[in-house]
């Protein structure tokens, strides 16, 4: 028996166009957006998808990918003093304490902890700049010419930028990593800090995880300069759709539109 898929993109595009006739499209509120089918990388919908914008904390998708590819989840990370007190969301790490890399990744991807992202950077890259070079090398390996990182957390920088399309491709690559998928699809996680003496519970900032069973991630972001940024992914019957919006004041609505559309996707057929 020969197995083949129906033309997923044709079906997705058709259903998407039908659904959004009665609901907002994912581009209504965003300056830049894209929806892609993960397996092929084909674009289903786009709006200024190749315009360079600040990614804010969606930067951390690449941070986690580089960390997982260059270290072990059971590695013990000694917190570098330079990571402590990093501006923005925080895990309130203390200099010298020892934390599992996996716990730092949960703090980064669920709690958006900037100090945890910095701690990972110092541990793996030796410095913020060194780790950013690793992130940029990984982006280059993916063929992404409109992405450049200055840091692992997404705080604003003059040469810290990406595009909706590039960010979708980064998420697409990251979702191939089983550890990454497990982390970003987790709703809440208790992690051990202060050398195991303190337990802190991180709740995923991605509210879509709590609304739809098919949502599998990925990451929220915000700075005053970048506005609201969001990368989400939904999966059903082996088809995964990734949605990215940048500078979107109504991102939850826009991503719900895509999720609703995805719930009506056809299954794979066998001939």
State what each model feature region is.
Residues 1-9:
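Bacterial N-terminal signal peptides that target proteins for export
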Residues 9-17:
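Bacterial N-terminal signal peptides
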Residues 21-165, 169-178:
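Active-site-adjacent loops and short helices of periplasmic peptidoglycan-processing enzymes
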Residues 144-145, 156-263:
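Domain-terminus/edge residues, biased toward the C-terminal soluble/receptor-binding domains
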Residues 262, 267-271:
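Single conserved hydrophobic/aromatic residue that forms the stacking wall/gate
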